[in-house]
Regions:
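CoA-thioester-processing core
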Residues: 1-51, 65, 80, 84
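Amphipathic alpha-helical segments at domain termini/boundaries
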Residues: 3-7, 51-155, 173-174, 178-192
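Short, well-ordered strand-loop elements centered on a beta-strand within folded domains, enriched
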Residues: 19, 168-170
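Long, contiguous hydrophobic alpha-helical segments, chiefly transmembrane helices and signal peptides
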Residues: 24, 29-37, 129-137, 159-160
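Amphipathic alpha-helical protein-protein interaction surfaces
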Residues: 34, 43, 76, 126-129, ...
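Long amphipathic alpha-helix in the N-terminal Rossmann-like dinucleotide-binding domain
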Residues: 157-166, 173
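Phosphate-binding active sites in nucleotide-utilizing proteins
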Residues: 194-196
């Protein structure tokens, strides 16, 4: 997903695309360097919002933030080749996300982390993975990339063995299974209920 895309030197997307890091909704945190590279593209505060909420954003917003470099229409493969040819013609070379610091420098990242931790305590008390997500993003500006990636893996491992993760994954698949009851007629009305 997006974790792999942000490790690329450049990214393109169709305008209708949505991008995000939904792992927190399953009790995990984004792996594959997502917590280390996204802050380098959008800044710590926006990365925290995206990672802790798990909600996707549209391609236009992602482009405005710097996650996507080029919005295209039509055939994505042909557009990708054309974009690569344009980069070559303009003499643009590699642009390693992990080496970028312009969105990290000169900003009070610690204040953004403290604010997000306080927000989580108020809105999501007791949830395990959101706080681990914040710790992983904190490593993006507090540690060199290699050490930040190591810290991300450690925190991912903590989330992986969490009972909350197991429960959230179970709930995720249970919701999908419940909507696929074989002998339930398709025209059965949905009923709202307030408690069970």
């Amino acid at each position: 997903g997006l974790e792999v895309a942000v490790s690329c030197h450049y990214r393109i997307a169709v305008k209708s695309a949505k991008v995000g890091l939904p792992e927190v909704k399953l009790g995990l945190l984004p792996g594959a360097g997502g917590t280390q590279r996204l802050p380098r593209l959008v800044g710590v505060a926006k990365a925290l919002d995206m990672i802790v909420s798990g909600n996707p954003i549209g391609a236009v917003e992602a482009h405005d933030l710097g996650v996507i470099d080029e919005l295209v229409e039509g055939d994505l493969t042909a557009a990708g080749i054309a974009f690569a040819e344009k980069l070559l013609a303009e003499g643009k070379g590699p642009r390693r996300t992990g080496e970028r610091t312009d969105k990290l420098d000169g900003v009070d990242n610690a204040a953004a982390v403290a604010a997000k931790r306080a927000e989580i305590e108020k809105k999501m008390p007791g949830l395990f993975s959101p706080q681990r997500c914040v710790s992983a993003v904190e490593a993006a500006f507090a540690l060199p990339l290699a050490e930040g990636l190591k810290r991300e893996r450690e925190l991912f491992g903590e989330c992986l063995v969490s009972p909350q993760r197991a429960a959230l994954v179970h709930a995720f698949f249970s919701e999908r299974q419940a909507s696929k009851i074989n002998d339930l007629p398709k025209d059965t009305p949905v009923r709202d209920f307030k408690s069970a």
